[in-house]
Curated annotation (Swiss-Prot):
Organism of derivation: Campylobacter jejuni (strain RM1221)
UniProt GO BP: tRNA pseudouridine synthesis
Gene3D superfamilies associated with the record: Pseudouridine synthase I, catalytic domain, C-terminal subdomain (3.30.70.660), Pseudouridine synthase I, catalytic domain, N-terminal subdomain (3.30.70.580)
Gene Ontology molecular functions: RNA binding; tRNA pseudouridine(38-40) synthase activity
Family matches, as InterPro entries: PsdUridine_synth_cat_dom_sf (IPR020103), PsdUridine_synth_TruA (IPR001406), PsdUridine_synth_TruA_a/b_dom (IPR020097), PsdUridine_synth_TruA_C (IPR020095), TruA/RsuA/RluB/E/F_N (IPR020094)
EC number: 5.4.99.12
Function as written in the Swiss-Prot or TrEMBL entry: Formation of pseudouridine at positions 38, 39 and 40 in the anticodon stem and loop of transfer RNAs.
Protein's UniProt keywords contain Isomerase: yes
Assigned keywords, A-Z: Isomerase, tRNA processing
Catalytic residues, chain numbering: 50
The name this protein goes by in its record: tRNA pseudouridine synthase A
Amino-acid positions noted as binding substrate in the UniProt annotation, renumbered to this chain: 109
């Protein structure tokens, strides 16, 4: 029997979502929790995130015995071994041919800025940043929407066969004392969102022109090589 696990995690506790040499990845921790329940099949993840990046909605799949008929009980037991940095939201039975990574239709991320006074208790979960022109940020983010070759918005080391991506949503909105950048696409390159966020901030700061941002999006020339900090970034949705 194959199951789909929907979960969230605190990225500060891990070196990234993928398995790591010293077993410090989200995948390692969740696999370890499953092993306590007698499930030793390879755990597959729908998305990868870097060190310090969080997820409010992540998905994994694993093969388990047919005797796990009570999935709510399995969820409860799995949470015992996953807490405090991973929380299992739901477990569903899926078809045997379900591909947790390749069946994905879209992924969504949110990048959170706080404009309030700095707090060390929040520093790992938001990017503290002065207030900016939200309307202007929306205009700049709009440049990303559509089918793009984002080769200049990609960290090295990825396993992508192509740098072409279709961005469905790239927008900014306010919530209380936060500003949030929301991205939705058919897929993302390694470091794409953090490079995109940093590039938009550079334009807002007057350190990069709109023309230069457009040229980087159009794959003509790379003007920004810097990434926004990982702590403000959240994987927020995966749709099949």
């Amino acid at each position: 029997m194959k199951i789909k696990i929907i979960f969230s995690y605190d990225g500060t506790a891990f070196l990234g979502s993928a398995t790591q040499p010293h077993k410090k990845g989200v995948q390692d921790a969740l696999s370890g929790a499953l092993s306590h329940l007698g499930i030793f099949s390879p755990l597959l993840m729908a998305s990868r995130t870097d060190k310090g990046v969080h997820a409010s909605y992540a998905v994994a799949s694993v093969e388990c015995g047919d005797y796990f008929t009570n999935l709510e009980y399995l969820q409860k037991q799995l949470n015992k071994f996953s807490h405090p940095f991973i929380h299992i939201k739901k477990i569903e039975k899926v078809k045997d041919d379900f591909e947790v990574r390749f069946d994905v239709k879209s992924r969504e991320y949110r990048y959170i800025f706080s404009h309030s006074s700095y707090s060390p208790f929040m520093a790992s979960y938001v990017h503290f940043y002065p207030k900016f022109d939200l309307d202007k940020a929306n205009e700049l983010l709009g440049f990303f929407v559509g089918k793009k070759d984002l080769k200049f918005f990609c960290k090295s080391g990825g396993d992508n066969k192509t740098t072409l991506r279709e961005i469905f949503i790239a927008r900014a909105y306010a919530y209380k004392d936060f500003s949030i950048f929301h991205f939705k696409a058919n897929g993302f390159l390694r470091g794409q969102i953090r490079l995109s966020v940093a590039s938009v901030l550079k334009v807002l700061e007057g350190k990069m022109s709109e023309k230069e941002l457009k040229e980087q999006i159009e794959a003509k020339k790379q003007y920004n090589h810097f990434l926004a900090p990982p702590n403000g970034l959240y994987l927020s949705r995966i749709c099949y």
